[in-house]
Amino acid sequence: MRRRYKQGERFVGVGIAMPFEIWEWESEVAAPPGALGDWRDVDVAAEVTRQTRLPAMLANDATAACGAELAHLDRGLHSDFLYFFIGSFVGGGIVLNGALFAGRSGNAGAVGSMPVYVGGRTSQLIQHASLMVLEKALLKSGQDASLLQDPEADWTAIGPPLRSWMDRVSESLAAAIVASMSVIDFPVVRIDGAMPRSVLSKIIAETRARIGRLDRQGLTPFEITAGTIGADARALGGAMLPILANFTCDPEVLLKDVSATTVAGA
């Protein structure tokens, strides 16, 4: 990571997008107990600053993806929406009045922790609508899960595990979306993810169908649409952090400080 900067080079800083509190998800990623514990004591932004001598800003990866989505839209036409990003862990964000809404603690839009009733029991959305769930299914069936690292690949060869996972994702997303609408009447829900667009399109179509079968009495109508960026949304959102911090009238449009350089999020 260390390097010597040439005279004339201009760097605003380093933006980092990553899941928060990853030590809390050892069982979900099949890590041995305690294997991720060391991350508790690592200040990632401070370490990057130490090695690069550049200001480093850290954001939750799903929050960063939501910020990137917002930056690519006409805020006059898309001023309010709920955002889901399906990555290794599902996450998301909230946009209100054309700005990312971080909430009191910076953790607004933590959709992965939302309770959903799926398969006869209540559990968190993250346990259903995450790519790690599909990865576990592939490994259990003896298939190579490395294909999931390429969102541009053809995933049709995965077969039944993919179909089963997509059903599970759409069922849990439908429940989470309808529950969210009872709190804030978003006109639009945008769903994106690190997967082929064909897979995302099928998930969105099935989610719409499942929502149509749920009791939505008392809720205002809303639209469900695909995100505009795809798998790169998290990286683009992270790259935007130093620019937003230095060159916008409202540097907290995506940034919500928890420490000097850390951004909390969904």
Predicted feature descriptions by range:
Residues 1-12, 25, 50-53, 72-74, ...:
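ATP-binding/phosphotransfer module of carbohydrate and carboxylate kinases, centering on a glycine-rich
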Residues 10-121, 237, 241, 246-266:
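Phosphate-binding/catalytic loop of phosphoryl-transfer enzymes
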